[in-house]
Amino acid sequence: MQETNRTEISTVGEFGLIKRLTENIQLQNPESLYGVGDDAAVLDFGSQQTLVTTDLLMEGVHFDLVYTPLKHLGYKSAIVNFSDIYAMNGTPKQITVSLAVSKRFCIEDLEQFYEGLQLACQLHGVDIVGGDTTSSVTGLAISITCLGVANKDQVVYRNGAKETDLICVSGDLGAAYMGLQLLEREKAVFEGEQEINPDFTGKEYLLERQLKPEARKDIIDALHQEGIRPTSMMDISDGLSSELMHICTQSHTGCRIYEERIPIDYQTAVMAEELNMNVTTCALNGGEDYELLFTVPLSEHEKVASMKGVKVIGHITKPELGCALITRDGQEFELKAQGWNPLREK
C-alpha cells in the first residue's frame, strides 16, 4: 500500500470512518428508502417497510471468552441486533448468522453459542434463516444480520427530534459498564493468583446487564398501547451522551439533560464508589445498556411520565444552544461523545 495521504482509522473513530466510506454512496433502487446513517436500513416493499441491520462482533474487541460463557454470547449477539430493530419502532423477524471459528473451538462450543442464540430468538419470535461459517486464525468472529418490519407511518428515525420535545430513556444506565469493570477486575486478580475465587455477591444485576442484556420490546409495546410515536429514537449501545449527540446532530437541534433525572441502579452506584469512579460519567459514557433513548412531543408528557420503566431526563433545544448536562448544583457542562469506540487508538 502507498504511504501517501495515509490517515489512521483511530483519528476519525467508528462513526467518522462510516461517514468517510459511505458519504458518496447513492441509493439506486426505489425499494431502498433509507440506507446508512440510522440503527437499521429501511426497504419499502408495499404497505410495510423492511428494516435491515448488521452487527459484527470480534473476540478481543467486543467480548472476552475468559469470562463470557458461549451461551451468554449467543444470546447477547442476537439481542443487540433485535435492539436496533426496536429502536426503529419495528419488529424483528429473521436473522442470518455467520461465524469465523478458530481451531480451538469444538462442535460442543458452537452448540452452546447456538443454544443462547435460539433462546433469544424464541423469546422475541425471530427465525434463524441462514448464514455462513468459515475458519479464522484470530479467534471467534460473529456477524449477524437482522431483518424486521414496520408499518410505513410508524418507522422512527434519529433525525426527527424537534425543539421542546421531551428526552426519555428506558430502564437504568451504567450497569453494563460496571459489570464489565467487575469482570475485568476479577480477571486481573485471577491471572495473578490461580487459587482466587471471585466474589460476585450482591453484584448479580451488574453481571446480568453485561453478559445477558435485554432488548426493550416491552417499551415499544407500551408506546404502541399509549398511542405514542416517538419523534426520534436510538438504542443506547455506545453510551447515553454519544447517542444523544447523534440524535441532536441528525435532527439539527441542541439538548439539555439533568443529572438528577438520569436513572441509575443502586448496585451501579455502589460499584462505582468501590472503583472510585464517577457514577454519572459511567451512566453517560459506559455503553452496552441497550436501553431506548427517544424523544416525544411535550404534549405527551403525562403519558410518558406515567409509563413504567421510562424516565424523562431533559428536553430538546435550539441547535445554537448546544448539548449540555445540568448538574445537581445547577452548573452546565457541554456533553461530549466519549462513549465506547472500537476504532479508538488504545
Over which residues does each language-model region extend?
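Extreme N-terminal cap/leader segments of soluble proteins
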Residues: 1-69, 88, 97, 345-346
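Glycine-/charge-enriched secondary-structure boundary and capping motifs
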Residues: 2-16, 20-26, 104-127, 137-142, ...
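Glycine-rich anion-binding loops of enzyme active sites
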Residues: 57, 93-186, 315
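Short, compositionally biased
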Residues: 179-200
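Polyanion-binding loop/helix "lid" in catalytic or ligand-binding cores
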Residues: 197-244
